Amino acid sequence: RSRADRRRAKEEPRTEKRPLGPELEVVETQVFRGPNYWSYDPAIRLLVDLGSLEDWPSNTIPGFVDGLLEMLPGIPEHSCSLGRRGGFGERLKEGTWLGHVAEHIALELQRESGAHVYRGKTRSAGEPGRYNVIYGYWEERVGLAAGDLAVRLVNQLVEPAKDFDFLVELERLILLAERRAFGPSTQAIVDEAASRDIPWIRLNEASLVQLGWGKYQQRVRATMTSKTSALAVDIAGDKDVTRRLLASAGLPVPRGELVLNEDDAVRAATAIGFPVVTKPLDGN
């Protein structure tokens, strides 16, 4: 929509008291693990559809801004496009679109969990009500979880649901970030690689990390490097890591999933499709 349309949406009086419902939804998700179309830094892109919320900027929804500031008191301090501290708080009060709000929530949630991420942007996807929401991340799974929670929080502020407890959801995100955090040795290596502009990616749920690309790549786990055969032996002994690494290289591997209990095993088998084979993670 044009700038004039946007201005009218912010300023014109409303005949309806509230939006039709919490209609913000994620249509597509992409993870960029290096420089990409949107950013030099790793980023997540959510293609979101606002539905009828396209006609409801933040300043037109009763209680939306106050509720958001109560749940995330640090979010109005974001600089946003105004380039100064508190800029996003001003944008919220003058009226901004809910995809843009979700972007800043995703960043703030990650900062609440201990990550230092600041960059994001929201751009029209070329269709009415659809936007590309791009935001930086430090740990991939935490970044994806933050985006999911951001969308749910926006919908909660539009129309509260009884079964949504934001503090419980935030605590789950923080616990996920703590579980996914590297140990001090691996973190020190990753930080040094980042300071030298050496790309790195996490290869498993633990501390297996690839530094560099192509023929220059090296792998480390904690302080053990791929210069020794011990690391290869450990990887080969872990069926899940081996399967994931082979699949990421484009080699054919059977579908599989790591499970820890009977209920998860039944769910995974149903998703994969019978017949299935069960094997211990490490051993034969």
Regions found by a protein language model. Name each.
Residues 189-208:
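Structured, non-catalytic alpha/beta "coupling" segments that mediate domain-domain communication
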Residues 183-189, 262-265:
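Domain-scale recognition of functional cores that engage charged ligands
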Residues 206-212, 230:
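Extracytoplasmic/secretory soluble proteins
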Residues 16-17, 30, 62, 218-284:
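Active-site nucleotide/adenylate-binding loops and adjacent lid/helix of ATP-dependent enzymes
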Residues 6, 12-171, 176-178:
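Long, compositionally biased, glycine/small-hydrophobic-enriched stretches that function as flexible linkers
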Residues 179-182, 194:
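Hydrophobic alpha-helical hairpins/lids featuring a short glycine-rich hinge
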Residues 74-80, 115, 197-199, 251, ...:
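Short aromatic/hydrophobic-glycine micro-motifs
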Residues 212-218:
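Glycine-rich loop at the start of a catalytic domain that most often binds anionic cofactors/ligands
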